[in-house]
Amino acid sequence: LTTKQDLRDNYPFGMFAVPRSEVSRVHASSGTTGKPTVVGYTKNDLDVWAKVMARSMRASGTKKGDLVHIAYGYGLFTGGLGAHYGAEELGCTVVPVSGGMTARQVTLIEDFKPSTIMVTPSYVLNILDEFRKRGLDPRECSLDVGIFGAEPWTNAMRREIEDAFDMHAVDI
């Protein structure tokens, strides 16, 4: 069993299961509680990850041809890229907005009309606040499915999100 401490003790690349030359991508935690934990992914790992994400998205109700708004951060954090490649694997059109720029998020949702959003549950509540600040009813927007993860959230948050957007909210 590999622990987070094992990854930190062997920072940055000491726990890779293959030579670094076979690693196609590196992701890492923010390191807020210590050294970042670094994980290397081979091409095969990335292909499997995309397929797993695509299956999870399909199970949520997202389907081929849907427009997917991705508001997870892109970069060392795994969220944005995992969601991105999973959506492409499923055959969706990706809007890779990344995190932040909440006003722009709402503008793009209103203009592009995505059916699925992928984001942290706490950040979608910020997006909800922006809808309300603009006097918009989020239930009237195009979002049918919310795929949320990367942090814990409560059943009360799920109900608030589902009720506010009239969407199906799932944890990934």
Name each region found by the language model:
Residues 23, 46, 73-75, 122-123:
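Short glycine-enriched loops at secondary-structure junctions
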Residues 38-42, 51, 60-62, 79-82, ...:
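Short, conserved acidic/polar surface loops in the N-terminal third of protein domains
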Residues 1-28, 33-51, 55-59:
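Nucleotide 5′-phosphate-binding alpha/beta core
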Residues 81-172:
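Conserved adenylate-forming
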Residues 16-20, 44, 73-74, 96, ...:
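Residue-level marker of alpha-helix boundaries and capping positions
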Residues 58-94:
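Conserved AMP-binding loop of ANL adenylate-forming enzymes
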Residues 29, 68, 117:
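Residue-level signal for inorganic ion chemistry
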Residues 50-67, 102-114:
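Conserved ATP-dependent adenylate/AMP-binding module captured primarily in the ANL superfamily
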